[in-house]
A protein has these predicted regions:
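H-loop/switch region of ABC-family ATPase nucleotide-binding domains
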Residues: 189-191
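The feature captures the beta-strand-to-loop junction immediately N-terminal to the Walker
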Residues: 33-35
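Conserved ABC transporter NBD signature motif
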Residues: 56-71, 213
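A short, proline-enriched helix->beta-strand linker immediately N-terminal to the Walker B motif
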Residues: 148-152
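Helical segment within the ABC ATPase nucleotide-binding domain
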Residues: 169-181
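Catalytic Walker B motif of ABC-type/P-loop ATPase nucleotide-binding domains
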Residues: 154-158
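Conserved structural motif at the start of ABC-family nucleotide-binding domains
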Residues: 2, 17-19
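Helix-to-loop junction immediately C-terminal to a conserved catalytic motif
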Residues: 48
Length: 235
């Protein structure tokens, strides 16, 4: 589904991402982990064609993302608050997304229903603009907006940030569910190793822009190796 070949990004003479070859199959749930500056967000931005690669390419379903816009019709993503439209209410924002993806109002209501617990009655019906919500609720709105389009490909950058523990557990379950039930290809970056290990089928460890480990994660098997790399002592 996603193919990366000789992908390189350079900022001010410094190579911040350099991945020779990476293939992600349809239906995989891939966790990106690494310390700050490892290149996780840069990789996601390149997959979404938000920044230009200095070398190499990214393909989605066989087409280069910088040469075709077909992938946009089946891709959902949330990187940060700049993806939101601050002067809209949540209802208006989700309706806007529905218009972009051809989702009618009734279908949109059905797709929002599984997120009711996640929203904690703090988002819909509040008559607030997105700019007036807390960081946590803005994060929720952005994630929901990416998922309600029922994408074939879903990319989320640090989806557990700003969320309370119950919301973190809730969204982890929903991400795993969408992958399992719809065969969605999911790529998430996170510093939360436990959640990544709990839901990911595969974990990619980046260091200074390079892919240094590609770990299969059957039954959470990768967590021990990740803990060793990050210097986390087992209890």
């Amino acid at each position: 589904m996603i193919k990366i070949q000789n992908l390189k990004k350079i900022y001010n003479g410094t190579t911040v991402l350099d991945i020779e070859n990476l293939d992600i199959a349809q239906g995989e749930l891939v966790g990106l982990v690494g310390n700050n500056g490892a290149g996780k967000t840069t990789l996601l931005r390149l997959v979404l064609d938000l920044i230009k690669a200095d070398d190499g390419f990214v393909e989605s379903d066989g087409k280069k993302v910088n040469e075709s816009e077909d992938w946009k019709t089946y891709t959902g993503s949330y990187i940060d608050g700049r993806f939101l439209v601050d002067f809209l209410t949540p209802e208006e924002y989700f309706s806007f997304i529905g218009d972009l993806y051809g989702i009618d109002d009734e279908t949109m209501k059905e797709r929002l229903a599984p997120f009711e617990t996640f929203m904690h009655d703090e988002i819909m019906g509040t008559k607030k603009y997105l700019r007036d919500f807390s960081q946590g609720n803005r994060q929720k709105i952005g994630i929901i907006g990416a998922m309600i389009v029922n994408p074939k490909v879903l990319l989320l950058d640090e989806p557990f940030n700003y969320l309370d523990p119950s919301s973190q557990m809730n969204i982890a379950r929903l991400i795993h569910q969408v992958c399992k039930e719809h065969g969605t290809t999911v790529i998430i970056s996170s510093h939360n190793l436990n959640f990544v290990a709990d839901i990911s089928s595969r974990i990619l460890l980046l260091e200074k822009g390079r892919l240094i480990k590609d770990l299969q994660n059957t039954d959470g098997a990768a967590i021990a190796e990740l803990n060793e790399y990050f210097g986390i002592q087992a209890e």
